[in-house]
Structure formats: structure tokens, C-alpha cells
């Protein structure tokens, strides 16, 4: 393993490690079990190398891989919580770290499965469960998440939220995390190289627009079809990149994160305090600012009427291009 970034836990804040996990080639349940043991081994070895480590993050699909022929089968799906998260919890407790893990989750109601992330604390408790709000359609078959965007307490005064891969391309997702109090947004991804530039750009913009840190990590390596770019990235709350990984599988990207500085910016900044200014427009001219919503898309989305002007001309609206059956439209 190589590494980029910091080595030592700061006096305030916390030390994080983003693992550029090699893209798993998974053909059977035995392969999944092998990945789980490899992830657990990585937790312990990384903690040994970085004794001050408090938060370790693994990418999307690091547990079950991206075998599109099998990824929705009973053999491949997991329950959350379940035996797999119990094993991760034991490892986090033994190494005294917070851990972020990716699980393709069996739908407990019997419907389509979810793409899920969990955070487990150093006591081995699952403190956050998130289901991907925006699956990467039309490639992914996952059901859109139904748990909102939860926030939990983390190390060093942090308030943590997690988004998954394509979620980070929507500024609304990062804004929702910040609006609910997150000062650190974690993004776990399984992107191939086609969107690496856009991935890095949105990691920075999500940080800047919301005055919060972003910790982002992607799978790395070649699976026989695509190359996954790794490039773990830690962005400061001002949108600058603090640490940037390379395209190496097994690279460990570490950084010192100071959530208190993001909190201070949110309280003390005037110019560019945009997470506040969005709801207090023009407060110099209008005491307290204008509160009314001026945005048509926000109103329409809230009313279930979101529709772009060119919607009737859009060519791809189902998963048939990737072999998924066309399902009847359901209007909620």
C-alpha cells in the first residue's frame, strides 16, 4: 500500500483514512466473504500504521463488487443490519475507529434492493444508515433511497453525512446534508474513469457551496471491463483540495480534518456564507432577508410536478439499454 497525506492525529479535529480499495471481481458468495475479511484486515492494518486514526472510509461496491449479472440475486444481497455489518462492527470496536462501509441491501419489504452505506462507531454501534437517493441510472437497478439524508455525530466535533457516488453530482444532496447540520460530507463511489474530472469538481463545489469538508474515495483498478480511478480527495470547507490521491489500488489517502473551522466559517463569515444566505436573500436591504422561495424547480419538486421543458423529447427513461425489463410507470 502507498499513502498520501497526514500521519498524525491533530490536537483538535480528527485523522481520516480513505482506502482506494481494489475493484473486487466477485463471482460467488465465497468471493464476498473474502472481501469482507480483506476489509477487516485493512481496518486493523491501517489503524496499526496510523495509531491516531479515527475515521476509515471504504468505497462503494467494495464489499460485493459490480457483477451486474448477479448483483441483485439472493446470493449477493445482504441485510442491514446483518452478519456482514456485525463483522464490520466488531472490527471497528477492536480498532477503536469509525468506519464507513458499502452494502447492497436486500429490500426488507420484498421489493427492489437498495444501495446502502453505514457508519459504525468505535463502540461497534451502527450510528447511521443511508440508502442511495439517486442511483446511477440507467446502469444501476437499485431502488431510490427512502431514508432521506441522515446526519450523525462523528469524531473531533464532526457532524457526518454520507452520500453515494452519483448522489454527489446533485448539489441538492450536499445542501440537504449541510442544512441538516453536517460539517463533513463523506462520498463513497464506484465510478469508472469517464467521469473522474466531474467527480473531483463536484467534491470541491459541494464543499465550497456549503462550507463543509468533503471526504471522497473511489474504487481503484481494472475489473476486466472498466478502470476505476481511485483518486481519494479531501476538500477544505473553502473548496480547495487538501489532499488528492492517485490512481493506485490500495493507496491510503489520509488527512487532518478540523470541523470546528467549518463551524466558525458558518457563524462568522458574511461574504460567501451561502448556506445561510440562500434563505436570507438581500438582508442588507431587507432586515432578516427575503424568505420566500423564488425557485420554480424547488416548488415543483416539492409538489411532485418536476418536469424539464425538454422532458417529452428525452430518449432514455428506462433501463432497457442495459438489459433491464421495462416496467410500468408508477406515479406517487
Swiss-Prot record:
Enzyme nomenclature, EC number: 3.5.1.49
A single BP term in Gene Ontology: putrescine biosynthetic process from arginine
Coiled coil: none
UniProt-listed InterPro entries: Aliph_Amidase/BUP, C-N_Hydrolase, C-N_Hydrolase_sf, Formamidase
Catalytic activity: formamide + H2O = formate + NH4(+)
CDD domains: aliphatic_amidase (cd07565)
Pfam families, sorted: CN_hydrolase (PF00795)
SUPFAM superfamilies: Carbon-nitrogen hydrolase
Keywords associated with the record: Hydrolase
Active site: 60, 132, 165
Glycoprotein is among the record's keywords: no
Molecular function via GO: formamidase activity; N-carbamoylputrescine amidase activity
Residue ranges of every copy of the CN hydrolase domain listed in the record: 14-259
Covalent S-S links between cysteines: none
UniProt superkingdom: Bacteria
Role this protein plays: Is an aliphatic amidase with a restricted substrate specificity, as it only hydrolyzes formamide.
Cited NCBIfam families: PRK13287.1
Family: Belongs to the carbon-nitrogen hydrolase superfamily. Aliphatic amidase family.
Protein name as catalogued: Formamidase
Originating species: Bacillus cereus (strain ATCC 14579 / DSM 31 / CCUG 7414 / JCM 2152 / NBRC 15305 / NCIMB 9373 / NCTC 2599 / NRRL B-3711)
